[in-house]
Amino acid sequence: MDATAFHPSLWGDFFVKYKPPTAPKRGHMTERAELLKEEVRKTLKAAANQITNALDLIITLQRLGLDHHYENEISELLRFVYSSSDYDDKDLYVVSLRFYLLRKHGHCVSSDVFTSFKDEEGNFVVDDTKCLLSLYNAAYVRTHGEKVLDEAITFTRRQLEASLLDPLEPALADEVHLTLQTPLFRRLRILEAINYIPIYGKEAGRNEAILELAKLNFNLAQLIYCEELKEVTLWWKQLNVETNLSFIRDRIVECHFWMTGACCEPQYSLSRVIATKMTALITVLDDMMDTYSTTEEAMLLAEAIYRWEENAAELLPRYMKDFYLYLLKTIDSCGDELGPNRSFRTFYLKEMLKVLVRGSSQEIKWRNENYVPKTISEHLEHSGPTVGAFQVACSSFVGMGDSITKESFEWLLTYPELAKSLMNISRLLNDTASTKREQNAGQHVSTVQCYMLKHGTTMDEACEKIKELTEDSWKDMMELYLTPTEHPKLIAQTIVDFARTADYMYKETDGFTFSHTIKDMIAKLFVDPISLF
């Protein structure tokens, strides 16, 4: 057994007792928020007469985390924007924002609109910081073959970095820093609200009703998140991780943070709870099979999961047996929570876990045989499912409404191309962030190491190549996102949101494993309310 020393939980049972200081004001905040929602709705309807105002208002509501209150109004406005030519096509800010919002909402618009902003030598002609930001963000909803958007990213990034050398207005400087760190399309929506509320509060043209509603909306959501954290922490404590599973990553709060990053709206509370539990259980499986167990023990656990029956626990060593039985019990309890009309969905939780375990077994076999996949594609075919991202995304669908049908789950079980793009993005990001740690722990060959061995490169060179492949996978995802299907758009939107969480968690390091790197942001999301004044 090769047990890697993971740091202990940073939160323990903190959320069992914690209540945000805003809790006593919940009733008043709810009443005030309802009044403001209608006031903002009137503002949104009034903006329909002018495309630029409509675009500005939509992007503001999205960034402040308010757009889910106005889904129908925003969809109607964007249909009008899509069909109308009544806008200034010489204004790069407007053209970029229009392009970004339409693509984000699934409308197919051509990137050729940006060629008119280049001179005879093919260089972009723009030096206004606001326009640069808009173009940079628009370029990241690119697909394959859109050379003009690839060039726009290179150009605008260089210009934005240079702009920080000159004095900028505080709100604009904050925007540039935020954008260079992560383009708008890839940011977690709930964290974007936390970051953008203070920026919006500095803007001269801010709408005070929208600003107040954004603060109330976040504080009310935070109360719901804390209730969920109490529930999942108490559930997690029953496993007695510190004593029985001391070798695993004890990360229940981080699991919930991850799920909230992908499904932040209040109506998805059950979805977050189920997905958080599944993420925690998948983490235990991963650490058992990848890091701690012997090959024989790992294969016994895999066999027990294939069988999915209590009697199979007799196959297992003591430290696996209790976990296995708790896994079965948890899936059964999820069925009870879902009720008779939706309990069938737990079948798909089981099937997704079996796929995960099958892939992990293959990786163990590779490790034991010192086998290196011949290509990155071969590697991803097996290692994509084992990163767990798609299983977690599917577990979030289990707790969602009736728009997610049995046919939806059957389709997801075929691992459609959109699912593969999520798995590839997550695996490549994970490997880039985790390679050095896992190499030292004697684990299976990552995509980074696979590339190094096949091409004779350094680790840094291989990481750069893997980053290029990650960008290609984002382009794959965008193309598939824009392709109409018979399945609810919510599925594609949520899968993209899970890709965003992977980008956040693995941007600089493995933030899930080394969770002190995200502790401050977890506190901002779950512990610290936003001041109304």
From Swiss-Prot:
UniProt remark on domains: The Asp-Asp-Xaa-Xaa-Asp/Glu (DDXXD/E) motif is important for the catalytic activity, presumably through binding to Mg(2+).
Cellular compartments annotated: Cytoplasm
GO BP terms: defense response; diterpenoid biosynthetic process
Up-regulation conditions: Induced in leaves by herbivory (e.g. S.littoralis).
Record field: transmembrane: none
GO CC annotation: cytoplasm
Reaction equation(s) it catalyzes: (2E,6E)-farnesyl diphosphate = (E)-beta-farnesene + diphosphate; (2E,6E)-farnesyl diphosphate = alpha-copaene + diphosphate; (2E,6E)-farnesyl diphosphate = (1S,5S,6R)-alpha-bergamotene + diphosphate; (2E,6E)-farnesyl diphosphate = (-)-(E)-beta-caryophyllene + diphosphate
Binding residue positions for Mg(2+) 1: D286, D290
Family: Belongs to the terpene synthase family.
Encoding gene per record: TPS10
Motif interval(s): DDXXD motif: 286-290
The enzyme's E.C. designation: 4.2.3.47, 4.2.3.77, 4.2.3.81, 4.2.3.133
Metabolic or biological pathway, per its Swiss-Prot or TrEMBL entry: Secondary metabolite biosynthesis; terpenoid biosynthesis
Result of changing S134T: In strain: cv. Delprim
Cofactor needs: Mg(2+); Mn(2+)
InterPro entries cross-referenced by the UniProt entry: Isoprenoid_synthase_dom_sf, Terpene_cyclase-like_1_C, Terpene_cyclase_plant_C1, Terpene_synth_N, Terpene_synth_N_sf, Terpene_synthase-like, Terpene_synthase_metal-bd, Terpenoid_cyclase/PrenylTrfase
Annotated binding of substrate, by residue: D286, D290, R427, N430
Subunit relationships: Monomer.
Protein name: (E)-beta-farnesene synthase
Residue sites binding Mg(2+) 3 per the record: N430, E438
Binding site for Mg(2+) 2: D286, D290
One of the record's GO molecular function terms: magnesium ion binding
